[in-house]
From Swiss-Prot:
Pathway(s) served: Purine metabolism; GMP biosynthesis; GMP from XMP (L-Gln route): step 1/1
Keyword Iron attached: no
UniProt-annotated binding residues for ATP: 230-236
Residue span(s) of domain GMPS ATP-PPase: 203-392
Record's keyword terms, sorted: ATP-binding, Glutamine amidotransferase, GMP biosynthesis, Ligase, Nucleotide-binding, Purine biosynthesis
Listed name of the protein: GMP synthase [glutamine-hydrolyzing]
Pfam families: GATase, GMP_synt_C, NAD_synthase
Record-linked Gene3D superfamilies: 3.30.300.10, 3.40.50.880, HUPs (3.40.50.620)
Protein EC: 6.3.5.2
Domain of life assignment: Bacteria
GO cellular component: cytosol
Residues in Glutamine amidotransferase type-1 domain copies: 11-202
Length: 517
């Protein structure tokens, strides 16, 4: 039977105490096929009861539970009869609230630590080795477990690394099972989700699509919706999902600012408009944007100009449409989490629709606001969007304008666009496109002496940036095979005008950012 709302799914909620890893916990649970949400630590008991979760996870956090102002939970949460897992600060909080003792550690643990499972019957460690390495990040520790709890694991500097109360189904781990640095972290979370909470893996993208289509139709009725289409993954998937739900009641405004990658605008129109039938108005505004950028060299100023101009073009087109009641945007769950509030009233500037005039009164519709990025990609493929479009490289809103260092001109954009197309073509030919997080070319504005044919040249340099990463927060430069780099370099110099040198960026993030501007 199809699910019609979120209450039809088994779910495990994560209460947020400020850990840098809190989103990861939610992602890991969803990866198991179980719906999960990250919610405020002070979520009311009434709301928790209404959600009827199969389990609750307390995230880690930077506070000390014994300090004034430390983040707390309503003590009634321990009387709900719902399984609870405390991670790091979450374990300390549960221990403290239930009568245990938490103190500052003599030796803080940050990074890898080896633990020993001391209880062979520990449910969280069922089927796992007695000795394993985990990721610790704490300055406090539990020095006395609450009454009714047993210690199930220890480390050299943390004698109480895990605790359990099997009767009440309360568990705590001092380490971060959600990060990949914990050897069997995912297995520990699985044991909690399936063996302790008895949750069913019934969260599927097919159900989500059906649920969202029903919700969109109910909310929109016979009214009209507009969407600012950037050509990126989020807005493209939003447009396709809305079209599936309401057809031509949706109008997508695609502002082509001339800073897109080679053939990208045409590819978007082919995939979404011609193949999938989405109603799109394409505005060719390349000259308008270039005129505004003339003489501008500061990267932040370029971003602001492009963002402001995008809004103005979008506004002009939106005003031409009659009787529009809804504005759609591709807000993701990460945006909702980062805002810390209900973002239903927030227009996101990075979706290029921020700053709408006060006389344009739209109700906001955000069909992706419960999904993470990789779930959006899965949704896009389910909706029939071409694989290459769904899995395209991350691309900044200002586009190639920030890959041309200094002033942006039509000739410089052409150089970056052509060199980037060559890079992507050779990476794809080498079968490396799925192994590299992001790769692109930049025009740093450096000119150098070269020799081409029998003559001396004084032309531009192209920089190649290719990185590997898991989440984009940190990144290493990709170790591309020399023969692939050689082919890329040769083709760029041969096929791109005014280029006589190619360099490869071998800097990690940090200290560098992935983009050059």
């Amino acid at each position: 039977m199809a699910k019609t709302n979120l209450n039809d799914f088994d779910k495990i909620i994560v209460l947020d105490f400020g850990s840098q890893y809190n989103q990861l916990i939610t992602r890991r649970i969803r990866d198991f096929g179980i719906y999960s949400e990250l919610l405020p630590h002070d979520l009311s008991i009434e709301k928790i009861k209404k959600m009827a979760p199969k389990g609750i996870i307390f995230s880690g956090g930077p506070n000390s539970v014994y300090d004034e102002g430390a983040l707390k939970v309503d003590p009634e949460i321990f009387k709900l009869g719902i399984p609870i897992l405390g991670i790091c600060y979450g374990m300390q909080l549960m221990s403290y609230d239930l009568g245990g003792k938490v103190e500052k550690a003599d030796n803080s643990e940050y990074g890898r630590a080896d633990i020993e499972v001391t209880d062979p019957n520990a449910v969280l460690f069922e089927g796992l080795p007695k000795e394993q390495y985990v990721w610790m990040s704490h300055g406090d520790l539990v020095t006395k477990a609450p009454e009714g709890f047993k210690v199930t694991a220890k480390s050299k500097n943390c004698p109480i690394s895990a605790i359990a109360n099997d009767e009440k189904k309360f568990y705590g781990i001092q380490f971060h099972a959600e990060v990949r640095n914990s050897e069997y972290g995912l297995d520990i979370l699985k044991n909690f989700a399936f063996n302790v909470c008895d949750a069913k893996a019934n969260w599927t993208m097919d159900d989500f699509i059906e649920m969202q289509v029903d919700e969109i139709r109910e909310k929109v009725g016979d009214k009209k919706v507009i969407l600012g289409l950037s050509g990126g993954v989020d807005s493209s998937v939003t447009a396709t999902l809305l079209h599936k739900a309401i057809g031509d009641q949706l109008t997508a405004i695609f502002v082509d600012h001339g800073m897109l990658r080679k053939d990208e605008g045409d590819q978007v129109m082919q995939a979404l408009n011609k193949d999938l039938g989405v109603n799109i108005i394409r505005v060719n505004a390349q000259k308008r944007f270039l005129d505004k950028l003339k003489g501008v060299t500061d990267p932040e100023q370029k971003r602001k100009i492009i963002g402001k101009e995008f809004i103005e073009v979008f506004n002009e087109e939106a005003k031409k449409l009659k009787d529009v009641d809804f504005l759609a945007q591709g807000t993701l769950y990460t945006d909702v989490i980062e805002s810390g509030t209900n973002t239903a009233q927030t227009i996101k500037s990075h979706h290029n629709v921020g700053g709408l005039p006060e006389d344009m009164h739209f109700e906001l519709i955000e069909p992706l606001r419960k999904l993470f990025k990789d779930e959006v990609r899965e949704l896009g493929e389910k909706l029939g969007i071409p694989h290459d479009l769904v899995w395209r490289q991350p691309f900044p809103g200002p586009g190639l304008a920030i890959r041309v260092l200094g002033e942006v001109t039509e000739d410089k954009l052409k150089i970056v666009r052509e060199s980037d197309a060559i890079l992507r073509d050779e990476i794809k030919k080498a079968g490396l496109q799925e192994d590299i997080w992001q790769y692109f070319t930049v025009l740093p504005g450096i000119r150098s002496v070269g020799v081409m044919g029998d003559g001396r040249t004084y032309d531009y340099t192209i920089g190649i940036r290719a990185v590997t990463s898991i989440d984009g927060m940190t990144a290493d430069f990709a170790k591309l095979p020399w023969d692939v780099l050689s082919k890329i370099s040769t083709r760029i110099v041969d096929e791109c005008d005014h280029i006589n040198r190619v360099v490869y960026d071998i800097t990690s993030k940090p200290p560098s950012t992935i983009e050059w501007e």
